[in-house]
């Protein structure tokens, strides 16, 4: 009997993009269901994630798996026949988990990114600077490698790449530029975009810009 896999997501969510990429990389057949998380969350979402009521939600044979980092690891372990996301070496595995945690620690990258379009003045300048510093730290870890894990697209790449689709929006509304200080990271993003899984999961950047304009209007941000 084939496994039933459903992914509840919201197209602009970089967290949902992660889970979709992981499923695509493993070749898992799944049903994607778009959620209206702003206006009308579905009964299934509220049933499967009653604590946080957030996406993404991965439903495997009727059982929910929550939080994107956990979902990626779950997918890696359940569909373990090919293309492991995490290294087998314990130390390298620990390093990958550390950098994934760094990206999501207190949602620092997400929060800084949000501030680039939701704040003004000195707060905006500080957010832009902090955002670039986080990216430069990640770029330093990437080094000369094609991917964070070396020659192979893996866990940290999946965790980070969703933010890449938001870079144009961050730059437009924050009035700053990422590429001059993060050339290697931008090249990494373009490399990842050549993968079918990533190209399928990430939305068009101009669509993200339009979505941010809607958010600014919704929240009364000039």
UniProtKB/Swiss-Prot annotation:
One of its GO terms (cellular component) is cytosol. The keyword Repressor does not apply. Residues 89-211 form the GST C-terminal domain. It comes from the Eukaryota. GO terms for biological process: glutathione metabolic process; toxin catabolic process. InterPro entries: Glutathione-S-Trfase_C-like (IPR010987), Glutathione-S-Trfase_C_sf (IPR036282), Glutathione_S-Trfase_N (IPR004045), GST_C (IPR004046), GST_C_Tau (IPR045074), Omega/Tau-like (IPR045073), Thioredoxin-like_sf (IPR036249). The keyword Transferase applies. It catalyses: RX + glutathione = an S-substituted glutathione + a halide anion + H(+). Keywords: Cytoplasm, Detoxification, Transferase. Its EC number is 2.5.1.18. Glutathione binds at residues 13-14, 40-41, 54-55, 67-68. It is an enzyme of class 2 (transferase). It is found in: Cytoplasm, Cytosol. GO terms for molecular function: glutathione transferase activity. Residues 3-83 form the GST N-terminal domain. May be involved in the conjugation of reduced glutathione to a wide number of exogenous and endogenous hydrophobic electrophiles and have a detoxification role against certain herbicides. Belongs to the GST superfamily. Tau family. This is Glutathione S-transferase U21. The gene is GSTU21.
